[in-house]
Amino acid sequence: MEKNLHRSLRTAAKGSGAGLTGWRFEYLAPLLRASGQEWEPFENLAAAIASGDVPLWVREVLSLGRATALKKGATGVRPLVCHEPLRRLLTRALIFDVHEDIQAHVGPNQFAVGISGGCPAMALSVQKLAHKHRNLVFFKLDLVNAYNTQSREDALESLQEAAPELASFLRQFYGTPSQYLYRLGRNDHTIITAREGIEQGDAAGPALFACGLKRPLDELRIALRRLVREGEGYEADCENEGQEGEADTPDATAVFAYLDDTIVAVPSQYAAAAFDAAIEVFARAGHTVHPGKSGCWSLDTRRESLPPSCQRIWEPDGLLVGGIPVYDQDKEPVLAQNKLREVVSNVAKEADFLVKLVRDNQLAADESWSRVQATLLILRYSLAAKLIYFAQTINPEIVEPFAVQFDDIMRDAYLKIVDIENVNDAQRLQLSLPLRHGGCGLRSHTANELQRLFVSSALLVAPAVHAATGLHVRPADSAAQDDAGIFCPNFSFKPLLKL
């Protein structure tokens, strides 16, 4: 406990939200410099809370949370809960101790737990399977409000198998209805009660949700294998039917997930039955597949050859897997270009709004707030990072023209915020230098930088892709057309390894 608790406190995010008591991680940070005699009482308190050996009122205080409504898309709302720092600290410490056990429990096809670059890894897995089995039809399933409707008992029971101590600790808070304080105004609030669902903002939330979704994902995987075996005339192998990995059939089936973002792949002749099976399996687990927001796509299967239920959700240009475009690399990258165009357009609107925040007194949050400093922080740490995710996963040649537009937007917004009209070449360079080197911290997405981001991401996710698909990602130009194509089959890695 001591080692993981110390690590949890040492790596706690500075400036994160306070609990209802007003406590923050910074108030506990001096314990990192405390002697063993001063640290021991804190460690004993943490151990008592972890084991449930504390008065009921302590558990009730730690179960409370402050709710915040975040914007989700154009009209949706994402509820976020901020718990007491002590609970968050202890939760992270317990997860450090069992994260490998949880990852082994949910398996390599759940990319949200224990996998660095989980979304890119899942997208690359889909891309590689699509090129290996070109007749596969891929479904991207949308589960309606999945996080907030997940059965708590199912999730805790599944977690119990992998991490009983963590499950026992979390049951103190998820075993009874949760209450959250939500402010309606400066002097007004309401209490929100939740009986099901995983709390977004809980450090254990992703692991707990992934455990809750494990059973339906496993059931769906088994059902699809059985479907293909029976269709191809194979007898079901009862001993191996529940194992992870590819199906032992002429064509592979796959079920991948990043939390509730679920990808299903089957040979085209089983597409309709697979879609119906997915709807049925998730319904038994309390989840609803939204047909209108789901999609399907294939490299070689034509839309006209699929049944009406699949034609209605057909995506001609590819799928967005975790927001990452997956498409036919031999055709025009329409999906990737549209996504990058959307990113640049949204960033331009947000940058314009930041400039308005500085110049329009009616938009001021408070008379005393430092508008220039605040908007520069948002520009540098939020907007300027929005291209990196896609630069790591899309062919640099596709990204480059959009990166030029993106950098121009960032630079123009910065100059308007600090009220500077023109800069020379030397000053332009200084804008892109890191703060620690005397620059302004506006990252420049040059061709070399885009290539570096792309290659480093591919190398990072390669082990996860191999674990999920059995396919290798080799950074060598000899395999550029084979199974190391990453997200652009004709892309050569050899010159980039020297960067």
For the regions a protein language model found, what residue spans apply to each?
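A conserved non-catalytic segment of reverse transcriptases
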Residues: S178, R183-L184, A194-E196, F256-Y258, ...
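Conserved pre-catalytic core of RNA-dependent polymerases
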Residues: M1-P216, R226, R452
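Inter-domain linker/hinge segments that demarcate the starts of reverse transcriptase
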Residues: W39-G52, M122-A130, A271-G286, L340-F353
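Short acidic, Pro/Gly- and aromatic-enriched capping/linker segments at domain boundaries
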Residues: E2-A13, L306-D317, D419-R436
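Extended C-terminal regions of large enzymes
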Residues: V418, N422-L499
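Short, glycine/acidic-rich hinge or "gate" loops at secondary-structure transitions
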Residues: A104-G117, R225-D237, P291-G292, P396-Q405
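Catalytic palm active-site di-aspartate
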Residues: G19, R66-A67, R78, L94, ...
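Short amphipathic alpha-helical coiled-coil/interface segments
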Residues: A46, F402-Y414
